[in-house]
Regions:
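Extracellular/periplasmic catalytic domains that process cell-envelope and extracellular macromolecules
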Residues: 67-68, 156-159, 193-197, 221-223
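Solvent-exposed loop/turn segments at secondary-structure junctions
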Residues: 100-105, 138-140, 168-174, 205-212, ...
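Alpha-helical scaffolding within the catalytic cores
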Residues: 148-153, 180-192, 211-219
Length: 324
């Protein structure tokens, strides 16, 4: 059985057709080529002119996080021969971390483990998704979420998966761990997510997406990231939140629908006084269109790949109240 397509590319310029049904950034499209690809250039049939180059490791207008589109051909410059392999059957990766025991520095979170493990174990049943790791208490570390530019290792941990889930204490400027490895707190200024792989992050942490600060604080963290789900206000943990959220994702709910439906049901006092939230990348400058706000996880519906530096952000909140 044929499971994929292999194109052998030579040193110099090669023509590559884009095979997928959805757009993808150049970094992801050409990932099998590693460092051997240097430049990719598309042709705009409307203007009958070549587009601005996408450079491996580039930023700004030359960023390798700019999108490549189905039905187009691209010139790809190679520094050495290599095979470009596209599998017909894709699997995606996810991870989870949780902190319940803060060693007296914070109030313990009783159900942190059950919430995160419920999410992890449920999504791991999907044939499209594979769990990479789940860490709890002192094994969950700030360095796993911090960009290497600031001394972290997220490119080996959460940013090496497509979806990352965290349960633990938080505040407007970040979230909190139980061990100082390397710090007790991940500050928003140390996050750069999506520059390796991550598309979606869920932070089951109080106030981390507070309306007054979240775009200013977390906007710079979007380096290919689609969205962050969390809480505008104080939140709450519940043993059924994680599995229920994952189950809704696999039933075809958008990430935002799944998150606010879950928090409506399981965040107490459940009277509408607490609010869940999402911050999502906007790709076209038109905030009346949902863009990444309407993302589904891969394999369960459509999604949109944003550039590394989004034009703007869409922010939504939902009052946590279960209505039968």
């Amino acid at each position: 059985e044929q499971t994929g397509v292999t194109n052998h590319l030579y040193s110099g310029w090669n023509v590559v057709g884009f095979w997928d049904v959805h757009q993808a950034c150049a970094r992801d499209m050409l990932l099998p080529l590693g460092s051997t690809w240097a430049t990719a250039i598309g042709y705009d049939a409307g203007t009958q002119d070549y587009e601005v180059s996408m450079i491996n490791g580039g930023t700004g207008s030359y960023s390798d996080q700019r999108l490549m589109f189905p039905g187009k051909a691209y010139w790809v410059s190679m520094t050495a021969e290599r095979d470009l392999i596209c599998s017909y059957y894709r699997t995606y990766s996810f991870c989870a971390e949780w902190v319940g025991d803060y060693h007296g520095m914070q109030i313990p979170i009783t159900w942190a483990d059950e919430e995160a493990e419920g999410f992890y174990n449920t999504l791991d049943w999907s044939s499209s998704w594979t769990g990479q790791f789940i860490n709890g208490d002192d094994a969950a570390m700030e360095r796993h979420w911090k960009d290497p530019a600031f001394g972290g290792m997220d490119s080996n941990y959460i940013d090496n998966t497509h979806l990352a889930f965290f349960t633990g204490h938080g505040w407007e400027g970040g979230f909190v761990f139980g061990t100082a490895a390397d710090d007790y707190e991940l500050n928003y200024s140390e996050a750069r997510w999506g520059n390796t792989k991550t598309d979606w992050i869920v932070l089951a942490s109080c106030n981390v997406l507070n309306e007054s600060t979240c775009t200013e604080y977390w906007g710079p963290a979007f380096e290919g990231l689609h969205s962050i789900c969390g809480f505008d206000t104080v939140g709450a943990a519940h043993p059924d939140m994680g599995w229920y959220f994952a189950d809704l994702l696999m039933k075809g709910k958008t990430i935002w629908e799944a998150w606010y439906t879950t928090t409506d049901r399981y965040v107490f006092p459940n009277d509408g006084s607490l609010k869940s939230a999402i911050l999502a990348a906007d790709i076209d400058g038109d905030l009346s269109t949902p863009d990444c706000l309407d993302d589904h996880i891969y394999g369960y519906g459509s999604s949109i790949n944003p550039p590394g530096d989004p034009l703007g952000f869409q922010y939504e909140t939902d009052s946590c109240k279960w209505e039968v």
